[in-house]
Amino acid sequence: LNIISLSSLSMLVREKDEERALKYIDQLSYTFRYLSQNGANTSFIALREEIKFAEAYSYLYKIRYADKIAFDFDIDEKYLDHKLPPISLQPLIGNAVKHNAISSKRLFRVRIYTDNGYLVVANNKFPMLEPNPGTGLGLTNLNSRYMLLLNREIEIINNEQEFIVRLPLVKQ
């Protein structure tokens, strides 16, 4: 995140795009602040806070990939005060980008929405020529946190067209 973020910021400065560079700095600092304040948090956070973080974090990717990537948020207001473990969306957004070939030939889309008490993250799949197998650690850790805090597993749906993760929300 650090090196990629600095490269994107450098690009904006070289392009003399002051407005976007300043917004990028704001979103980057918010992202780092959220991660540092909530990284050791073993309780819950309101969905509204996690979504605010996800919007800032996704902005960093939108600058890096320009018109090749889109993030769609559709959050029902009735769920904004529901809870989930903090930093649940970061590994899902990061994995979506990491495991797909993002190019100007087609739009890569990540949808984040609520559905019957779940927060859902879904992305279309564009396989890479040389797949990045990853370790699966991000999803494993996220599932472990849900089991520890909620005694519930996250739901993973992986088909040919889409990769979907459903996170249970807690009404408190």
Regions found by a protein language model. Name each.
Residues 1-168:
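Two-component histidine phosphotransfer core
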